[in-house]
Amino acid sequence: MKTTTYSLLALAAASKLASAHTTVQAVWINGEDQGLGNTDDGYIRSPPSNSPVTDVTSTDMTCNVNGDQAASKTLSVKAGDVVTFEWHHSDRSDSDDIIASSHKGPVQVYMAPTAKGSNGNNWVKIAEDGYHKSSDEWATDILIANKGKHNITVPDVPAGNYLFRPEIIALHEGNREGGAQFYMECVQFKVTSDGSNELPSGVSIPGVYTATDPGILFDIYNSFDSYPIPGPDVWDGSSSGSSSSGSSSAAVSSAAAAATTSAVAATTPATQAAVEVSSSAAAATTEAAAPVVSSAAPVQQATSAVTSQAQAAPTTFATSSKKSSKTACKNKTKSNSQVAAATSSVVAPAATSSVVPVVSASASASAGGVAKQYERCGGINHTGPTTCESGSVCKKWNPYYYQCVASQ
């Protein structure tokens, strides 16, 4: 890691803030698009804007602003299903930029029973990815390369309603206390299979992080060799002990981030032999990326292939039981890079796989010199429109970035 490289990124960050913000907008189940979920009749507890949460003690850390309000719909899944989260800055168009490339950081996924999770309790981490020294890549870099998509495999938990909480921590201002930006939403699911692996007691959100945690107060612009992913260990998919903060690591296939459409494999939790992602429920050929997945529990190397023809295959974070520090994933990068090969197998070492960032739409101004909602409307060096479309107001976030947000 060269200090000069990140010094340049620091300068670039201010000018790219218009592309910074992001939200989860859709979900895929076994390769099948579930449609927009951030609508009034959707299945995502969506905030009123795509702005980050920066106060780790705020109740907005649980499911974002208005996250205590239930969404209209709930998606049905079963153990072993592959769930793909799709992030965007503005919309699902091809021009959407997902998240600014300067916004380096980890991507994680938590889950909790709906009633408890809504109150900020019993959150269990099922996937994580951070920094890869061997390729000098962050999880957000991989997310961008994969068009804002990342996967988890539904663990073999008892039937019931659950919230899945994908999260991005952007560290472009992480060199100062309170500078890290948190992006998260809660997606509503009903698990229809009835597994025997109860979730651990988990952690509280807010409560799991502090503003001075090593992975939150972190300077990406100075030289470093590793990165400590914040939060608890990734659950192994079977143990019922409490999920507390500790050391862990996660491996991700950087090769899967290439814009290829090779077939990828999915493995299932221990109670199932394989997930046929190419079955009728999964549509063998999809318009978006077919997930690369590892399971929430060890399996017998059973796999199933999916063929994708359009976008890059989403990266799956194959997690493992952790004994060493949560730092660079270099020990597993080579083996996981093989995951991207067509019809390759992935055996998940006892944990749920998951995540990649969102696709943000470009912040270009709309016709007529009026900025659309979520687009930039002012700040240092801004040369675009300063007037927002009807229903939006121009809000100052910092001297460099003003954004059109919904009128209150």
UniProtKB/Swiss-Prot annotation:
Keywords: Carbohydrate metabolism, Cellulose degradation, Copper, Disulfide bond, Glycoprotein, Metal-binding, Monooxygenase, Oxidoreductase, Polysaccharide degradation, Secreted, Signal. One of its GO terms (molecular function) is metal ion binding. SUPFAM superfamilies: Cellulose-binding domain. InterPro entries: AA9, AA9_LPMO, CBD_sf, Cellulose-bd_dom_fun. One of its GO terms (cellular component) is extracellular region. It is found in: Secreted. It catalyses: [(1->4)-beta-D-glucosyl]n+m + reduced acceptor + O2 = 4-dehydro-beta-D-glucosyl-[(1->4)-beta-D-glucosyl]n-1 + [(1->4)-beta-D-glucosyl]m + acceptor + H2O. It comes from the Eukaryota. Disulfide bonds join C63-C186. Residues 369-405 form the CBM1 domain. GO terms for biological process: cellulose catabolic process. Its EC number is 1.14.99.56. The keyword Oxidoreductase applies. Its cofactor is Cu(2+). Cu(2+) binds at H21, H103, Y183. Glycans are attached at N151, N331, N381. O2 binds at H172. It holds the Pfam family AA9. Has a modular structure: an endo-beta-1,4-glucanase catalytic module at the N-terminus, a linker rich in serines and threonines, and a C-terminal carbohydrate-binding module (CBM). The CBM domain is essential for binding to and subsequent oxidative degradation of polysaccharide substrate. PANTHER family: ENDO-BETA-1,4-GLUCANASE D, PUTATIVE (AFU_ORTHOLOGUE AFUA_1G12560)-RELATED. Lytic polysaccharide monooxygenase (LPMO) that depolymerizes crystalline and amorphous polysaccharides via the oxidation of scissile alpha- or beta-(1-4)-glycosidic bonds, yielding C4 oxidation products. Catalysis by LPMOs requires the reduction of the active-site copper from Cu(II) to Cu(I) by a reducing agent and H(2)O(2) or O(2) as a cosubstrate. This is AA9 family lytic polysaccharide monooxygenase A. It comes from Aspergillus kawachii (strain NBRC 4308) (White koji mold). The gene is eglD.
